[in-house]
Amino acid sequence: MRERRGLNITRACALLGFTKQAYYKSRKRTGERLVLERQIYRSVLSLRKEDPMLGGYKLWLMMKDAFGSGKVPGRDNFYRLLFRCNLTLPRARPRHTTNSNHRFHKYRNIAKMIQPITSNALWVSDITYIEIEEGCCYLHLVTDAYSHKIVGWCLSESLQARYSVEALMQAIGQAGEDLSGLVHHSDRGIQYCSNAYVFELESRGALISMTEDHNPTDNAVAERVNGIIKQELVYPSRRFRDIQEARERIGRFIQFYNGQRPHRSIGMLTPSQAHRLHGPLQNLWKKRSDEGAC
């Protein structure tokens, strides 16, 4: 509101039914809100560089943690801010493939009877393909089922079992040599049934569990981690130039995933935080029709 000939701010406020002090307070609040929204916008852009498909609900919680619950808009207003700034997300398509036609021994599913209450009690492993300009490569993952932390990974140009063993050895390196009491769960892929892989587990006291009915829910945590990497890193990006670029980008994403990305299924903790805890974790996961594609 500007002063014009014959109509100053005081008179204009009186005509509109509020005081000049109220006008200046409102203008100050508007300015502060715009400054905060610009800060939130820059923070969201920074986080999306690490995780291009990070959803609106998680971003809202992360902004409240960064700027304070009393300053950040409510959830619905935050979603509107994302919409105004063109920061809402499209829905991604899931993709999956598996093959277990081989001569090696296949173990029964004992993981379905286990509800871990600490880390390094149940590991789940899987392999997913990553497209690059030269064709594709393969991401071998070992994930802790309690904390959802990725404890071992390897990106390779082939499906040879030695690369799955490399990811497993990385997981063993952080857990220690004695795996007594740990259950390792996977699909029936030849890599996990191979003599080399089985030896590394059984020689350290681990028990082996495998899916039985070709049902993705039999290895749900591993499938979910695959989906997060695909939907939040791979699908939104241009195709990786080569395996070296893919390895670098995936490595950075896994660091972000473990250390910064909260999960509803573990009480909105990060996997690294949950990995240090003991006891049941709160599962906040449910369908949120009010979140849309955020």
Where are these regions (language model features)?
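RNase H-like polynucleotidyl transferase catalytic core
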Residues: 91-97, 183-188, 202-221, 237-241
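Acidic/histidine-rich, metal-coordinating catalytic segments
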Residues: 177-194, 212-216, 269-272
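Active-site beta-loop-alpha junctions of metal-dependent nucleic acid enzymes
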Residues: 135, 154-177, 193
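Basic, flexible linker segments flanking DNA-binding modules
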Residues: 13, 20-119, 215, 270-284
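C-terminal domain-tail junction helix/linker
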Residues: 195, 202-206, 228-294
